[in-house]
Amino acid sequence: MAIKTKTSLIPSCSSPEDLKRVLQTLGSSWGDVVEDLERLEVVPLKGAMTNEVYQINWPTLNGEDVHRKVLVRIYGDGVDLFFNRGDEIKTFECMSHHGYGPKLLGRFSDGRLEEFIHARTLSADDLRVAETSDFIAAKLREFHKLDMPGPKNVLLWERLRTWLKEAKNLASPIEMDKYRLEGLENEINLLEERLTRDDQEIGFCHNDLQYGNVMIDEVTNAITIIDYEYSSFNPIAYDIANHFCEMAANYHSDTPHVLDYTLYPGEGERRRFISTYLGSTGNATSDKEVERLLKDAESYTLANHIFWGLWGIISGHVNKIEFDYMEYARQRFEQYWLRKPLLLEG
């Protein structure tokens, strides 16, 4: 079946009925979308913290036993403070063109329809399975090597400074003091000076490689990395650092905002991931290369804590998703100040 992508001026969605009408409108040319709204099932998907995500299921016109699924993504409030939606759409379409991730099926004013990938989204525990972690490491190396259009400049430091300005504009005087926002520009400057090197490898980074953005085909073990909203060119060590930090999170627990840093991977687990990452291309990898990237990734966790700490403050003011963004931010900044003496001054 040919799937057409089109842009629509459909108004915003605020209910399951709205989502069903979006599907009927954008899918009118597919030839298998039923007209009876009662036969369309809308299922909210948990774990998203930037957008609201739904799955729509329906029996197709080809028969009651033949079902289709699509994914509907409703853009979160205030996301334009974090990234340019037009650029994100271009990245999404480019990734689809390269055979990565889901296809874009249609757009409406505050969201889009995506192909539903028939694979299992990973759980927090999956990241700690050695074989699965190896698959992710190899896929991440492949991701970093993508030749994406546009400038290949590092975006990390510019983005941190932009987000800091937004956080300061939104924060109350009490929050300014609690999160030590006045001094963060100096911290960002220090990190950029200490972590930037001419010989560091720059790649197209996902920047949000938490378990919910990784899917696995349980037959072939093929890994699919999804959700490219924060993607940009950055030091690969930063992206690996982000992945390691995400091992402290479980966004499907009763307290999804709580981070458990006793779960942060030990040196042996991190070394294995990086060795697999570097060796996945088939080229010989030296111990020196592994140790250098291991050290760099650990140092870049500091930038990662500031990144997601600022994200938490901004989101706490603009996003209506049920998640304790401010407490999440507090934990990320706490880790920054705890780890900084060990990683920069030790």
Curated annotation (Swiss-Prot):
What catalytic activity is recorded?
A: choline + ATP = phosphocholine + ADP + H(+)
Binding residue positions for ATP: R73, Q210, D227
What lineage is this protein's organism placed in?
A: Eukaryota, Viridiplantae, Streptophyta, Embryophyta, Tracheophyta
What EC identifiers does the entry list?
Answer: 2.7.1.32
What induces the gene encoding this protein? Answer: By wounding, and salt and osmotic stresses.
* Identification of the protein by name: Probable choline kinase 1
Q: Source species, please?
A: Arabidopsis thaliana (Mouse-ear cress)
What protein family does this chain belong to?
A: Belongs to the choline/ethanolamine kinase family.
CDD domains in the cross-refs = ETNK_euk
Q: Name one GO molecular function term.
A: ATP binding
Q: What class of enzyme is it?
A: transferase
